[in-house]
Amino acid sequence: MRDVRGDVVRRQLKADHNISVAKVRSICGYLISGETPSEAIAERVDDLFADPIIELGAANTTMLTTPSFGDGPETVITVGFKPGVTDNPGKAATDGFLTLFPADGDAKIATYTTYVFYGLPADCDANWLAGTLHNGLIERALVADRAACADQSWPELTFPTPPEQVFIEPQSIDLECDDATLEEISTTGLLALNLNEMHAIQAHYR
């Protein structure tokens, strides 16, 4: 079956960066934090997490270790939301999960996407490639380069548990600073603003 998500990435790399890739496959992953036994979840994978007509589903395992991906990818990049960032697909999956397992009322689900590359140019840097696939302000990415793929050392994200909320007294922030410091303020303050937006705030308070 055609992998639409993978094809979109492959075409964008060619259109935006003139990088030709033979094939890109994708994996939609779900991380579940709850009390439901893993065996019970495994029995309902095709009811909630995968479309059995066009997708392969598995539970309690990494899809990259299954025969479906036994053809030796050259680079693997996994992208998921950072802790505390709204994960709308995860919220939708949580709603469906609670319909199937209503007793697990505190369960939460986080999503991630893994991109699997074949026929990648030898001079294409895996970390640069990851930078084109995710927004570093709100997402995190793990990379398996050629060496890691050869060793079958696959990237695995953990559940993005938000840190404990601690009240912090309001603080004054000096916005008369260089661009690098503005970007650091946006990142550490979880503002998720790009540099142009930070410039607008800086100009507003001058």
Tell where the protein language model's regions lie, with residue ranges.
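Core nucleic-acid recognition elements
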Residues: 1-206
